[in-house]
C-alpha cells in the first residue's frame, strides 16, 4: 500500500494547526485549566467512547474483518511487549532512576486515542478507528499492569489495580462495540434499522467532536510546560529519537518482513508505534510525584516532534 506523503504531511500540519489554536486559547485565558479539564473529561467519558462504538458499528461483520481485529489484538500485544524490552534496554544510558523509568514509560505508551485516532481515521477511514480501538485495549491492560511495575521500582506505594485493568474508558466501549459488531451480522429487519438512523446520526455527531476537542486540549497543555527546559535536556531528545523514529521503523520491518501481516496493517502498526507519548505518563507522574516536570516535557516534546517524524517514517517505510 502506498501513501501520498503530501496527504500524511497535510494531516500532520492540520493537526498541528488545531493544536496551535488550543495553545493560544489557553495562553490568552479563553480556555483555562478548569475548562481544559472539563473538555478532557468530555473526550474521555463521552466523545472518545462514542467514536469507538460507532466505528465498530460501521464495520461489516465478516470472517475476514473479524480475523483482522483478532490480528490487531495480537499485534498490539507484540508491540507493547517489544516496546517494554526496547525501552528497558535503550534507556539504560540514564543513570537517574526516576528519569529512566519515566523514559521507559514514554517509549512504551503512545497517545493512541487522542493523537492516533485522527491520523488513522484520515488514512484508513472507520476501519482504522476500529483497529486503533482494538489496539488500545492492550494499551490499557498494559498500562495498569506492566506500566505500574515500571513506575513502582523503588516504591512501595504503587500497586496494580485489577479493577482498572478491566474497567476503563478504553476497554468498556470496545466491549460494547464488539457486541454491536456481531449483532450487525445478524438478519435484523430493515424497518428496525431505518428507525435507528437518527440515533446513529447523533452518535456520528458526538464521535466527530473527539478529534478537534482532543487536539485543542493537547495544544493547551503545551502552555503549562517549561519551554526553556523543553530544549535544554539531552534525555528528551534521546527519548524522541528512540520513540518517534528508531522504534517504529524497527516495528515496521518486523511486521512486514518477519510477521508478514501485509503492507496496510504493517503501516498501521508502525504509525501506532510512532505516536507521541501518552498523556497517561504525565498523569501518573503527577499522581505519584515522579518528576512530573520531566514527564510533561517528554509528552510535550514528543507531541511537537511527531508532526515532523510521522510523515518522515511513513516516507522511509515506503522505501522498503
Where are these regions (language model features)?
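Alpha-helical transmembrane segments of multi-pass small-molecule/ion transporters
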Residues: 1-320
